[in-house]
């Protein structure tokens, strides 16, 4: 099954058998699992996941690939293919009381907004394993003070624990991307954050990192005054990249003290 990659869909197909096996080993699918694969593409990972005996829901936007996947996997395993945009897909419609294990080689051009879309559905997700641009994985896994630390780092940490698993070179794909990729594991916290907390933390984080070269005293002006920052135990002279998730949660609580 060979498909001409479409640039507008951000298609870079994984072709390296060794990397595919590494991903499957990292996921460790079991027959009792309910898997969701985002962007199955040519089905190379799909095939290996199905061999575990797990139930697999595949979400693919490219109608030509959907048709090819249906032909290739007709009568194979427990597979259901959904033609549609993962950015608009509601996982709760297929969760039916079960938590989902989500995997995929995500299109790099929409990876960050897609991650936030999935975070909004974190209550039905058991874990996630994704191939992403290495820079995005570095941001997901960064802690306060790290070079890659930013808005994505803080918001991801609010929802889950991120773990960088391994890097993947451009030569493992067709066509070859211009960047190094990496596989990340995201495990949601036992208790997901409530919508109110997410909204407040996001407001503080966006303001802080929107002017990251400024001190919080200036970056958060109009949102929080210095008294509120001190009350939260935060130095108004600090900068966005110096604060941990706990610090941002503390600041967010000062929005409605």
Swiss-Prot record:
Return the EC number: 2.1.1.182
Q: Which InterPro entries match?
A: KsgA/Erm, rRNA_Ade_diMease-like_C, rRNA_Ade_Mease_Trfase_CS, rRNA_Ade_methylase_Trfase_N, rRNA_adenine_dimethylase, SAM-dependent_MTases_sf
UniProt-annotated location(s): Cytoplasm
Q: Where is the major localization of this protein?
A: cytoplasm
Q: Which Pfam families match?
A: RrnaAD (PF00398)
A GO cellular component annotated for this chain's UniProt record is: cytosol
Q: Which UniProt keywords apply?
A: Cytoplasm, Methyltransferase, RNA-binding, rRNA processing, S-adenosyl-L-methionine, Transferase
Q: Please give the superkingdom of this protein's source.
A: Bacteria
Q: Which GO terms describe its molecular function?
A: 16S rRNA (adenine(1518)-N(6)/adenine(1519)-N(6))-dimethyltransferase activity; RNA binding
- Mind telling me which SMART domains this protein's record contains? rADc
Q: Which residues bind S-adenosyl-L-methionine?
A: 12, 14, 39, 60, 85, 105
Matching entries from Gene3D superfamilies are given as: Ribosomal RNA adenine dimethylase-like, domain 2, Vaccinia Virus protein VP39
Q: Which reaction does it catalyse?
A: adenosine(1518)/adenosine(1519) in 16S rRNA + 4 S-adenosyl-L-methionine = N(6)-dimethyladenosine(1518)/N(6)-dimethyladenosine(1519) in 16S rRNA + 4 S-adenosyl-L-homocysteine + 4 H(+)
Which family does the similarity line name? Belongs to the class I-like SAM-binding methyltransferase superfamily. rRNA adenine N(6)-methyltransferase family. RsmA subfamily.
Q: Report the function annotation for this chain.
A: Specifically dimethylates two adjacent adenosines (A1518 and A1519) in the loop of a conserved hairpin near the 3'-end of 16S rRNA in the 30S particle. May play a critical role in biogenesis of 30S subunits.
The protein in question is named: Ribosomal RNA small subunit methyltransferase A
What is the organism of origin for this protein?
Methylococcus capsulatus (strain ATCC 33009 / NCIMB 11132 / Bath)
